[in-house]
A protein has these predicted regions:
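N-terminal leader/targeting segments
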Residues: 1-115
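Short, aromatic/basic amphipathic alpha-helical patches
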Residues: 113-128
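C-terminal edge-of-domain segments
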Residues: 126-156
Length: 156
């Protein structure tokens, strides 16, 4: 696993969120002091546009959360409990590769599951078969373990 790539993603996301929060606070101050039709607000909008989009795509962030949840839950396996949209497959799988993840289990039970299976295969993954994972969960302040059924994929 590539902890350094994960740490870099964590750092970049935190920096973006801090800057976004500061800009939002500054916008509120400008609106209060000068109003929305002021030159200061125009400058704020230009700054907001220059800040650019979030540093990572939706697919990259889903891979990040797969990695993060495994670390936080002291798990042995990577679980994808969400689903990918069509535009997210490539970035999701590429980020898993960068993170050094060689297999994951999708446990999502949505109607998009079939599309996700085909999307992962199209990105070069191999469907291994059904797989049950055990994961730690926190319920009512108590840690307990539960199982989840899913489909195991190898990231090639």
């Amino acid at each position: 696993m590539n902890d350094s790539y994960f740490e870099e993603m964590t750092f970049q996301c935190a920096a973006y969120e801090r800057a976004k929060k500061e800009r939002a606070e500054r916008k509120a101050q400008i609106a209060e002091a000068r109003g929305y039709d002021s030159p200061e607000m125009d400058a704020w909008y230009a700054e907001e546009k220059a800040a650019g989009p979030y540093p990572y795509s939706g697919g990259e962030m889903k891979a990040y959360w797969v990695y993060k949840m495994r670390r936080e839950n002291d798990g042995d396996e990577f679980e994808m409990s969400d689903y990918c949209w069509d535009k997210e497959f490539h970035d999701f799988i590429e980020t898993l590769r960068k993170l050094g993840i060689t297999e994951f289990t999708i446990t999502n039970k949505s109607t998009a599951l079939m599309e996700n299976i085909y999307g992962f295969i199209a990105e070069g993954c191999t469907m291994v078969g059904t797989h049950t994972i055990t994961k730690k969960s926190l319920r009512w302040g108590e840690e307990e373990y539960e199982t989840a059924q899913g489909i195991l994929f190898k990231v090639n």
